[in-house]
Design a protein with these regions (language model features):
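Bacterial N-terminal signal peptides that target proteins for export
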Residues: 17-27
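Bacterial Sec-dependent N-terminal signal peptides
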Residues: 33-63, 317-323
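Hydrophilic extracytoplasmic domains
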Residues: 250-326
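Structural motif
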Residues: 58-70, 186-194
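A sequence/structural signal for flexible, mid-protein segments enriched
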Residues: 145-236
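Short, low-hydrophobicity acidic/polar segments
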Residues: 85-178
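Single conserved hydrophobic/aromatic residue that forms the stacking wall/gate
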Residues: 1-15
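Tryptophan-paired
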Residues: 74-122, 197-278
């Protein structure tokens, strides 16, 4: 039944006020329920979403004195609870910079990224991450390894990036150190060097890989390194980088020199240089060595079976131009 209401009567006014109060109460209940549900949903999203930390990475270059700063540095953050979810950042010129990554506990490795020819293995694992070198065939068909490029780096076993106050940055300080040795050599007592068309050299009892987080050599690895050289007046000279001599006990270091004359004949000279290698003090695996080899040999002029050069892919060579003070 519809009753017309006299808007000027007290009865109608009372009914209207009562209906208005009921509507307001229902509206308030709805609003509070909506706020509560929204707050719960936001709270869940907040817990599910990782908080990011601002990190300022600082490079301390005081321990690099014999080499220019690299083209850039790569920093890898390994979460301790999930190494597969690494965070990788590049810093051109090795300059300091700020990055953001989820709050967590990390282990960190850094190294220069201008390392053409390096083979990186197990880079998804902090403890197994390895710098390796490629295999190559020597002029007498032996399996050897190429020499690595210059490498520097650092590692930190534990970095806690949690509960960092808003608006502030956590500092991660990295101090790169030299991670390769510098070997140079001179060969004396050779005659007929004007007949040399090509040459290579090798050194056995060396390590062709390096564990990055331990800055250490594999305990069970011994390889021969193959490298370049040049004729300089009455000598053959050269230089190369290496991770160091093998950690295996009793492994000899034999220097082999491959010479091809202009008629295609190959000569192979060798000499044990173990004493020269091991007499140099090392810090860890690092120790620069200068090898002096003395032969009494004349490069023949007779023709051989092959051409005047070695059949080696030039991409397998990482030549090092060095100033050698004799």
């Amino acid at each position: 039944e519809i009753v017309d209401c006299d808007w000027s009567s007290d009865v109608c006014s009372s009914d209207l006020r009562r209906q208005a109060v009921i509507r307001i109460r229902f509206s308030l209940v709805f609003i509070f329920l909506w706020i509560g549900l929204t707050a719960c949903e936001h709270k869940d999203l907040c817990y599910d979403h990782p908080h990011f930390a601002t990190v300022r990475v600082i490079f301390d270059w005081t321990k690099i004195s014999n080499h220019d700063k690299p083209e850039g540095m790569r920093v890898v953050f390994y979460p301790t609870d999930d190494e597969s979810n690494t965070w990788i950042f590049d810093f051109p010129g090795g300059e300091d910079g700020e990055v953001e990554l989820p709050e967590n506990v990390y282990r960190v490795i850094c190294f220069n990224y201008d390392t053409v020819g390096m083979v990186w293995k197990e880079n998804g694992s902090y403890t197994l991450f390895t710098a390796d070198t490629r295999d190559v065939r020597s002029p007498d068909n032996r399996t050897m390894a190429v020499t690595p490029p210059w490498l520097c780096g650092d590692h930190i076993d534990r970095v806690i990036l949690k509960d960092i106050p808003g608006g502030s940055a956590e500092i991660v300080r990295l101090t790169p150190v030299n991670m390769v040795c510098h070997y140079t050599y001179e060969v004396n007592g050779l005659r007929g060097l004007d007949r040399v068309a090509d040459l290579r050299a090798a050194l056995s009892g060396m390590s062709g890989s390096l564990n990055m987080s331990g800055d250490s050599l594999p305990a069970d690895l011994s390889e021969s390194l193959l490298f370049d050289g040049m004729v300089s007046r009455n000598q053959i000279i050269g230089g190369f980088y290496t991770f160091g001599h093998s950690a295996l006990e009793g492994e000899p270091n034999v220097f082999r020199l491959y010479i091809k004359n202009r008629s295609g004949s190959m000569s192979v000279l060798e000499q044990d240089v173990s004493d020269q290698v091991h007499d140099v003090p090392v810090a860890g695996h690092i120790g620069d060595v200068h090898l002096v080899l003395n032969f009494d040999y004349e490069v023949p002029s007779e023709p051989g079976n092959g051409g005047p050069g070695f059949d080696v892919d030039v991409d397998d060579w990482d030549d090092v131009n060095v100033d050698i003070v004799l």
